[in-house]
Structure formats: C-alpha cells, structure tokens
Regions:
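Active-site gating loop/helix substructures
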Residues: 46-48, 52-65, 107-112, 117-150
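Acidic/Gly/His-enriched mid-domain segments of enzyme catalytic cores or analogous surface patches
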Residues: 1-88, 306-347
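Polyanion-binding loop/helix "lid" in catalytic or ligand-binding cores
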Residues: 72, 122-180
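A structural signal for short, well-ordered beta-strand segments and their strand-loop junctions
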Residues: 28, 90-94, 101, 173-179
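Conserved catalytic-core helix/loop/strand module for nucleotide-ribose chemistry
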Residues: 21-54, 133-148, 263, 270-307
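Acidic, Ser/Thr-rich peripheral helices and adjacent loops at domain boundaries
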Residues: 4-7, 18-24, 108-128, 192-203
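Long, compositionally biased charged/polar accessory segments in the mid-to-C-terminal portions
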Residues: 159, 168-347
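Glycine-rich phosphate/pyrophosphate-binding loops
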Residues: 1-3, 7, 82-108, 300
C-alpha cells in the first residue's frame, strides 16, 4: 500500500493518526510537506520534486529526486506514480467529485470527522450537511452518474474532473470505476464490479515484489545543505528584524500622521529593494503566501495607473493601506519559513 502526501499546509498533519503501524506502507511525498509526516515513515518513503519554489530550493541545494509532472491533488499524484511504476490497469475507485445526497466528504475522512464533532441533539448531522451544501450556492452544478442517477457537484470539483479527462483521455489502461459522481470524459467508465471481474482475477499479493527503498541515515545532514539553510535563516532573520523596526517606529501606537505614513511607505520601499537583492528569498516568501503577494501587485498597479493619469494627485493613504496589508503578509511568511528551516536543521 502507498500513501501520497503533497500539501505543505500544516493542516495536512491532521490527516495522519501517527499510531498506525507504517512498516508495510510506502510514503510518496512532496518534500515541502510538514516534517512530521515523512518522519513517521522511516526507511519507507520516496520524495518527488514539486513545482512550488520551496521544493525547487531544496532541489538546488541537495539533489534531484525525479518529477511526477504537474499534479493538482493526491489522486493525480497517485495516478502519475502508478504510471511511473508501469502499473496496468490503473483503476480509480474514489473520485466521486460530487455530493452523496447532501454529504460532501466520505465517511471517516478528517473533514467528515471534524464535521461530525459539531453534531448535537439540536443540530443533527442533516443540519450541518445542509449548511455545508448551501454555502456553495451558485457554484453548484448538476449531472448524471454512471447509472443515470442525478447528482450534485460544484464548479471546483468539476475542474478536477476536467484535469483527469485532459491528462488521461484516450488511455486504455486508466479505468474510472467510481460509481458516484459524474463520469470522467475520455477514459473508460465502468462499474467497480465489472472492473474486478475483468481485471482483478489474480491476487496482487501472489505476484507483487517487495518494494525496496534506499536505506537512509536519518542523522546525516550534508554540510553544504546545512550551510545553505543557515544562510537562508539569517536572511529571513534580517528581514524579520527590519519589519520589527518598522512596527516599533510606526505601528505600535495610534494610526500615524501624514509624516509617519510617508516614512512607513519609504521604509517598506527600502525593504522591498533589500528582499529583491536575493531572488531565492523573494520567491520563498512569495511561495508561502502567493495570494498576499498578488493583492500587493494588484494594489500597486492601480496606484501607479492613477499616478500616470494625474501627476498632481496624492495617493499617500492608498500607499499606506497597501503596505500595511503587505506588512502582515511579510511577517507571516518570514516567521513560517524561519521556523521550518530551523526544524530542517534538527531532523
């Protein structure tokens, strides 16, 4: 059995109980996932190169691990890895991508259990399921499942369906035997019973080979890699220190006056120039909070456009609001990266 983990968000840890014996499991993971996850699979794990910049940074300072290509979910990664192993056929059995009546997540999943924790006599399970589905509003879509039964999905879930269709369309060895949800266009869609009857007449355990991974020295940290991490931590500490100085000067008391706003905006401009002196650091910060950086780019573009249209207009308040929001983005990004780079030194 193989476990796939790709999401660097700390929330990913909640999907693992860390009590189950993992000696018979193989972890295939993005190196940017929380460290507790690969640590739970000693000697039984394979990392693959990811497209996020944090993973690229690790590749640059260690070694290439191999790439599964562009992936958008655990399921896509699993299919890609199965193709890498030359598995045939590859049978999908869990890609419902729709609601089961009003239930979104499968039983015993992290999200479903979290949902069930809210159940009470006054607010039963059906109440919470209705609240969940009602949040999607105009994003709800309708379709037919494999057996001609009407199902409800969302635009987001349909996008995952489209990715499967685009990547695996026309492949005769990728079979979708998920009996709920909208069938995946371009691949073979048949019932699970048919798949088992046609393709699974021989027990896998009778013909499988033991999957061996390279024995690793858990305590070995290559010195060049360690030095790279230490340099990056120092750069992040410098940025964090400059942010703290700006906070003490302009943000710890009441809203600054005009002069204070001018100095804060100027201080942030100097900080941007400092960050951009090291492209790696800038990309790492952006990779942690891409949405925050996008908001800054959008706000900055709007301000520059207004200045082009009217050279005499004062946009100090807008510049201050732009930089104030981005200040929090930089603080969060720098703190997160510092903590996790420091963790990397201890494992």
């Amino acid at each position: 059995d193989i476990v796939i983990s790709i999401d660097p968000d700390e929330l990913t840890i909640n999907f693992f109980d860390f009590l189950t014996d993992t000696s018979d499991l193989l972890l295939v993971y993005n190196p940017a996932v929380p460290n507790a996850i690969p640590k739970a699979f000693p000697q039984r794990r394979i990392a693959f190169d990811s497209e996020v910049y944090l993973a690229e940074w690790f590749i640059k300072h260690t070694e290439k691990k191999g790439n599964l290509g562009k992936i958008s979910s655990v399921a896509h990664a699993a299919v890609k890895f199965s193709q890498f192993l030359a598995c045939s056929p590859i049978i999908l059995v869990g890609q419902d991508l729709s609601f089961c009546q009003q239930r979104l997540h499968c039983f015993h999943s992290f999200y479903y259990d979290e949902h069930m924790d809210k159940v009470s006599r006054l607010n039963p399970r059906t109440y919470w399921e209705h609240m969940k589905i009602s949040k999607f509003g105009p994003n709800l879509t309708h379709g037919m499942d494999l057996f001609g039964k009407r199902v409800v999905s969302t635009i987001a879930m349909e996008s995952y369906n489209y990715i499967f269709s685009k990547k695996f369309k026309g492949l005769q060895n990728v079979i979708n035997s998920t009996e709920g949800g909208v069938p995946i266009e371009g691949v073979i869609n048949i019932s699970l019973k048919e798949s088992l009857y046609i393709y699974c007449r021989e027990l896998v355990k009778d013909k499988k080979n033991s999957f061996r991974t390279t024995q690793l020295n858990e305590n070995k940290i290559f010195k060049p890699f360690q030095d790279s991490i230490l340099r990056q931590i120092q750069l992040l500490k410098d940025i964090s220190g400059k942010l703290n100085t700006l906070k003490l000067k302009f943000l710890d008391q009441r809203t600054p006056g005009r002069k204070g706003k001018e100095l804060f905006v100027k201080g942030m401009e100097i900080l941007y120039e400092y960050i951009l002196e090291n492209k790696e650091t800038a990309l790492l910060l952006q990779g942690y909070d891409f949405a925050g950086f996008t908001d800054w780019y959008r706000s900055n573009y709007q301000i520059l456009r207004k200045k082009e249209l009217s050279e005499d207009c004062s946009l100090l308040d807008e510049e201050f609001e732009r930089d104030l929001k981005f200040f929090d983005v930089l603080v969060g990004s720098a703190d997160y990266l510092m903590v996790n780079f420091e963790k990397a030194l201890t494992h």
